[in-house]
Swiss-Prot record:
Its cofactor is Mn(2+); Mg(2+). This is Ribonuclease HII. Manganese or magnesium. Binds 1 divalent metal ion per monomer in the absence of substrate. May bind a second metal ion after substrate binding. Its main location: cytoplasm. A divalent metal cation binds at D28, E29, D123. It catalyses: Endonucleolytic cleavage to 5'-phosphomonoester. Endonuclease that specifically degrades the RNA of RNA-DNA hybrids. Gene3D superfamilies: Ribonuclease H-like superfamily/Ribonuclease H (3.30.420.10). It is found in: Cytoplasm. It comes from the Bacteria. HAMAP family: RNase_HII_B. GO terms for cellular component: cytoplasm; ribonuclease H2 complex. Belongs to the RNase HII family.
Length: 212
């Protein structure tokens, strides 16, 4: 029996608008657990009224096919009040750790918006460095419409970046696995070595380095 796919709701946004908040931004990240490349965050402010079949297709980016993510990305960025993207590279991730790096990418994404939101809906995290009212929602990318939209923006933005890095660092098949720790990726690292865009503090790469 196939797993049930949750349809994100706009209940949080509706409740916040009743409380007087207008510019409500959803925030999510992509690439947190990868072995290579940056962690990327998306921030999106969607208008309260949206029409079109695509609206009902929005889901957590992880359950969508690449083609559907691209399709939805185009609608989201064209209909958004504003959207922003932040990225923190592998060297910064190794230096500060993935949790602070993720928060920094989210802060960058908020700063990339063309207008300041008055409330943030964040997938799971709290962002103490951003002095705005906010709410962290567990599984927010599956449950909350604005966060689901942000997850798609983050994922598509990162996937496009990894496809570019694939041309700069051939032989790792980055466009295929997007830097995640697949068997193919680990095999390529074993054969070619660790590249300048790999996260050296992440297992199994740290073990490879420590074993040298």
């Amino acid at each position: 029996m196939p797993a049930t796919v949750i349809c994100p709701s706009r209940a949080e946004e509706k409740l916040l608008r009743k409380q007087g908040f207008i510019l409500i931004a959803g925030l999510d990240e992509a690439g947190r657990g990868c072995l290579a490349g940056p962690v990327v965050a998306g921030a999106v402010i969607m208008p309260p009224r949206l029409k079109g079949d695509w609206v009902e297709m929005v889901r957590d980016s992880k359950v969508l096919s690449p083609a559907k993510r691209e399709y939805l990305y185009c609608h989201i960025v064209s209909m958004a009040v504003t959207f922003g993207v932040g990225a923190v590279d592998n060297e910064q991730i190794d230096s500060m750790g993935i949790a602070p790096a993720t928060r920094l990418a989210m802060k960058q994404a908020v700063e990339d918006l063309t207008c300041q939101p008055d409330f943030l809906l964040v997938d799971y995290l709290k962002l103490p460095d951003i002095p705005l009212p906010q709410k962290g929602i567990v599984n927010g990318d599956a449950l909350c419409f604005s966060i689901a939209c942000a997850s798609i923006v983050a994922k598509v933005s990162r996937d496009r970046l990894m496809s570019k890095l694939d041309m700069e660092y051939p032989g790792y098949y980055l466009a295929k696995h997007k830097g995640y720790g697949t068997a193919l990726h680990v095999e390529c690292i074993c054969q070619k070595g660790i590249s300048p865009i790999h996260r050296r503090t992440f297992a199994p790469l740290k073990g490879m380095i420590d074993g040298l």
